[in-house]
């Protein structure tokens, strides 16, 4: 499978590592610490754990355009704004929420936020 993961924090990086070890093609979207992560391949929140070389770290969702699945490992409080900003990359593919809780402003669960952008929504 071709998988994109938005969010290179602890959870997103861990998910990317598991899928890469399973032989899947992985693109890990890291807009905030892209250069550091490319240089060290060590996510800030995972200690000394290195990301497998098979993971392609990208700074733009445009590089994820052809991937089949998009896992969103961003905090629930940032999910709605992330989706609005990246709307064009969310349609026509399954979206998998990798976050917990509800949006404090709207009271919406991650699945409800994502359902505004795709009819194919799941929660991990």
Stretches with model-predicted labels:
Residues 1-51, 56-59:
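NAD(P)+-binding Rossmann beta1-loop-alpha1 motif at the extreme N-terminus of oxidoreductases
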Residues 51, 58-124:
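Rossmann-like NAD(P)(H) cofactor-binding subdomain of soluble oxidoreductases
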């Amino acid at each position: 499978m071709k998988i994109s993961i938005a969010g290179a924090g602890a959870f997103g990086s861990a998910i990317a590592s598991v899928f890469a070890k399973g032989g899947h093609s992985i693109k890990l979207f890291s807009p905030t610490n892209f250069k550091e992560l490319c240089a060290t391949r060590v996510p800030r929140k995972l200690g000394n754990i290195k990301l497998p070389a098979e993971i392609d770290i990208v700074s733009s969702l445009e590089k994820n355009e052809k991937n089949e699945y998009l896992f969103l490992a961003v905090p629930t409080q940032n999910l709605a704004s992330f989706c609005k900003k990246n709307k064009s990359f969310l349609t026509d593919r399954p979206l998998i929420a990798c976050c917990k809780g509800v949006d404090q402003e709207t009271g919406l669960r991650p699945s409800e936020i994502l359902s505004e952008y795709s009819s194919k929504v799941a929660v991990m």
